[in-house]
Amino acid sequence: MMNILLINGPNLNLLGTREPEIYGNKTLIDIEKDLTKVAKEKSINIECFQSNHEGEIVDKIHDSVKSIQGILINAGAFTHTSISIRDALIGSKIPFVELHISNIFSREDFRKESFLTDKAIGIISGFGISSYFLALEGIIGYLNGKN
């Protein structure tokens, strides 16, 4: 069975209440349940992880090297600031898809810079909650050699 790690960064635990006009009304728990269900139907195991702390995300990536085949990451604000998460992803050699609920390229200038994009196998941005499901399809296709 293929094992995928879903990483959500800072403030994504507030989904459903934080700026619903941008991020929608679904909670992170709702998204994780729905994504896990879809993955299970495809014989994929998803491990969900969320942290507001950069070092915890780095540690999770390090701890996943031997058990995870692909990563889906919505790094939140760390997308624009974290060299340590970037380096952990590169060092892990685990293929990853960067994802965002909103279109980060149509927002404030500081959100247009990503420390992850050039190392990701792909980026999904701007499709709302569907970004998670599109990213899952992308990583599955990549890992199955359909890229």
From Swiss-Prot:
One Pfam match: DHquinase_II
BP GO annotations: amino acid biosynthetic process; aromatic amino acid family biosynthetic process; chorismate biosynthetic process; quinate catabolic process
Catalytic activity, EC: 4.2.1.10
Known pathway: Metabolic intermediate biosynthesis; chorismate biosynthesis; chorismate from D-erythrose 4-phosphate and phosphoenolpyruvate: step 3/7
A single GO molecular function term of this UniProt record: 3-dehydroquinate dehydratase activity
Keyword Lyase (UniProt): yes
Catalytic reactions of this protein: 3-dehydroquinate = 3-dehydroshikimate + H2O
Gene3D superfamilies: Dehydroquinase, class II
Site (Transition state stabilizer): 18
Signal peptide bounds: none
UniProt cross-references to InterPro entries, sorted A to Z: DHquinase_II, DHquinase_II_CS, DHquinase_II_sf
Keyword set, alphabetical order: Amino-acid biosynthesis, Aromatic amino acid biosynthesis, Lyase
EC top class named in words: lyase
PROSITE patterns per UniProt: DEHYDROQUINASE_II
Subunit structure: Homododecamer.
HAMAP family referenced in this protein's UniProt entry, alphabetically: AroQ
Family that this chain belongs to: Belongs to the type-II 3-dehydroquinase family.
Role noted for this protein: Catalyzes a trans-dehydration via an enolate intermediate.
Record-given protein name: 3-dehydroquinate dehydratase
Organism ancestry: Bacteria, Bacillati, Cyanobacteriota, Cyanophyceae, Synechococcales
Gene: aroQ
